């Protein structure tokens, strides 16, 4: 049985579809459109990142040479910071400057 937090951090198919359209079927970091998926939490699930449209972006999978999702999750500190800055700028361009990472966290 899933906990409330686990359910809240899952990404429903409806959210993936909205994100896929919002991101124009492309990685929001490098712009590639092959081997990309709308399933990357900006604030990670481990940190309570919600599975909502404002916390999910489309990034390259490991099949894409750029591997943006892998670098964002497992890269060097510098890679993670650079990718986060690009994602943050993108999200603010979509949702306005009121978009904040702190609003993407699960709250009890």
Where are these regions (language model features)?
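A boundary/linker detector
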Residues: 1-17, 24, 31-36, 81-108
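Processing junctions and N-termini across compartments
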Residues: 21-24, 54
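The −1 position to Zn-ligating cysteines in a subset of zinc-ribbon hairpins
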Residues: 26, 38, 59
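Short Cys/His-centered divalent metal-binding micro-motifs
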Residues: 32-35, 56-86
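Short linker/helix segments within small regulatory modules
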Residues: 43-56
């Amino acid at each position: 049985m899933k906990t409330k937090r686990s359910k809240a951090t899952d990404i429903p198919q409806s959210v993936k579809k909205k994100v896929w359209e919002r991101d124009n079927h492309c990685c929001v970091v490098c712009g590639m459109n092959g081997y990309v998926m709308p399933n990357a939490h900006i604030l990670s699930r481990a940190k309570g990142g919600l599975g909502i449209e404002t916390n999910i972006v489309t990034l390259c999978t490991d099949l894409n040479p750029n591997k943006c999702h892998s670098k964002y999750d497992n890269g060097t500190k510098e890679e993670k910071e650079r990718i986060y800055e690009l994602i943050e700028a993108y999200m603010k361009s979509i949702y306005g400057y009121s978009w904040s990472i702190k609003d993407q966290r699960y709250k009890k």
